[in-house]
Amino acid sequence: MNSYTGIGRRALFAAGTLLATPALAQRAARPTLLATTGMVGDLVRGVAGEGFNVETLIGEGVDPHLFRPTRSDVSRLLRADAVFYNGHRLEGRMTEVLARAAAQGDHVLAVAEALPRERLRPNEDYPDAADPHVWMDPTLWAECAPPVARVLSRLRPGQDFGPGVEATRQRLARLDAYAREVLAPIPAASRVLLTAHDAFAYFGARYEIQVESIQGLSTEAEASLANIEAMVNLIVERRIPAVFTESSVPDRAVRALIEGARARGQRVVLGGTLYSDAMGRPGTYTGTYEGMMDHNITTIARALGGNPPARGLNDRL
């Protein structure tokens, strides 16, 4: 694993030890719940309801694979009453401290690691982990809600978090139904989703779309010329109509695909920018999980030949 920048390993080790000690977290009247990513934060907020401060550590457009924690970030982790993270090495440079805390404390949860391993996809970059991008399947993401509720129940033993879990399930079931409806009309020959890195495998498996990417599950390594050439060959052979950039990943490699295909006489367009490892700007529709996924589903369907409404599921795009 790469060395930490901006904060020493000893500081992270100390943070892991302190995080694993629930007595150090001050149980305020309005507890603070700290989530690493926007997707995890949105899930926690939906289950928790009112009465909690839900904060997110990794900001808009920041790649969690490459996020470098600062001393201020560790301070926020220490002050939080509960910490929720994705797990399966999504938070690459924070993996050790978060895993240590989750193993020893009952107020730290890796939401994706709470799912049965047989439901998850393999991680070729890290054999000890699964593919971390579970939020790309709304039905799988909904299954992360009950483990969140169990952690919250330790903070508020008298509070019933069942309604939040059920509301989350219903909201994500509606999102899933929308995806199935608008993606189904995509012609078989066009059912290929080509993106910068391999964040959409769960999405592809759920909606029967072949997923191809220039990079692997992690964005830590640069795309190789060989990978780009292989993807250009695929575009030409399958006559793929569109490719997609990602909001948290540089678009150089994807634009190289477009130019490479053009040089081979195959026209391929940029189908749009998808939200993969980070949501949109806080306070906007795409700054929510539902809005992020609505945008992705609608954008993919429109570019590949589906039949989405002009402004998406909730008429807010």
Each language-model region and where it sits:
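N-terminal secretory signal peptides
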Residues: 1-7, 11-22
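Extracytoplasmic metal-acquisition and chelation regions
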Residues: 4, 26-317
